[in-house]
Amino acid sequence: MLNASLRQLSSLLSEKKISSTELTGEFLARIKALNPDLNAFITMDEEKSLDQARTADEMIATGQSTLLTGIPIAQKDIFCANGWLTTCGSKMLSNFISPYDATVVKQFDQVGMVNLGKTNMDEFAMGSSNETSYYGPVKNPWDRLAVPGGSSGGSACAVAARLAPAATGTDTGGSIRQPAALCGISGIKPTYGLVSRYGMIAFASSLDQAGPMARSAEDLALLLNVMVGFDERDSTSLQREKEDYTQDLEKPVSGLRIGLPKEFFAEGMSSDVSSAVEAALAEYRKLGATFVEVSLPNSKLAVPVYYVLAPAEASSNLSRFDGVRYGHRAAQYANLEDLYAKTRAEGFGDEVKRRILIGTYVLSHGYYDAYYLQAQKLRRLIAEDFKKAFEQCDLIMGPTSPTVAFNIGERCNDPIQMYLSDIYTSAASLAGLPGMSIPVGFGSKNRPVGLHIIGNYFREAQMLNAAHRYQLATNWHELTPPEMNR
């Protein structure tokens, strides 16, 4: 059961071969056994989860169930959930109990899925390794000396270790795709605006997007069917006709034009990642796809552009955490200004402070034009590069991460190397394009490698189809970390 797909779990539940209460109990027991070592979950509430499971069993018994009713899911701790501790991986919110549900949480509740708990993450989603969390680092289930990636590292670890059949994540510059690659699972960041951000604690509002993480592309399609939809409470939410992302999964990919950006296959990619990606592309050739070289000349500037714009937005978004309304509050202070300073100094970790400082600097008088405005112009050029590339191809493919997972602690004192983990993912984020990662093999030390698939706007169905056809021909997505296969 722990290795079952969402459809298989749905069949077991609908045929009464297992109840949601029993299924949820099995996952809770597994979390209890393995989480002390992996640290994938921050918060669990067994009684709340089992209450939801009992409600799901009633829905199934009375014929009110959906395909996902009764199936457990883990929620990234960036999503507000009514009555749940919602920390965003920070001391600043270590005592915050959310009084309402994020739209994403509510959507899964409405179809009868069961919330297993809140997963660990980089503090305020700022990080590529899940080492900035106030609750400690998450370990990669394939090699517990390695990072799981970030910022959705807890969600990626939970799915890879079979602590949950699915999880939610968020992606600002690669935070779904990079941990999915490093943990050997599938994850998708939809087109910006397709999934509601209401109740999702903001990092960089023009980049943040929620998406699902699971073992396979088919599972992602089922989850995306629930998550995508217009929400009037989110000013950036897009009003589009509802789409069934499972409809074209089985379609052959013969004739699919795959663009290979020369900038993604240049220096910087490790040889083990290159070998696994080349083997995956060879599999697509066997499936009938054709390849065309494309160019994204401004993508080499994506990381510096991202690390100007995202911190600028974070500087503004995180100004609300001041010790007055909610969250951490300094115990001793001389006056109001001192309260703000001490609360933020105590409540935020070093990486969050670094990005607030960068963001405040680039927005300040005298530097706004030189940095922020220039970065916005380059963002537009990056989007134009993708527009030209998609005139020649249907999808763009390349590596998700330049290396396999690095060791915990290895890059903590080298922020530049840490930021370069997003070198292949941040360009699509800046353009607002959908991107996904699927497992395509292993590199050094038997650590997973991911293939990055970028689609044109609203082409999630085409991306999922291409990923699913690859997964029908291979079994990388079915593999379980050896020490977790029990």
Swiss-Prot record:
Belongs to the amidase family. GatA subfamily. Pfam families: Amidase. It is an enzyme of class 6 (ligase). Signal peptide: none annotated. This is Glutamyl-tRNA(Gln) amidotransferase subunit A. The keyword Protein biosynthesis applies. The gene is gatA. Heterotrimer of A, B and C subunits. GO terms for cellular component: glutamyl-tRNA(Gln) amidotransferase complex. Transmembrane segments: none annotated.
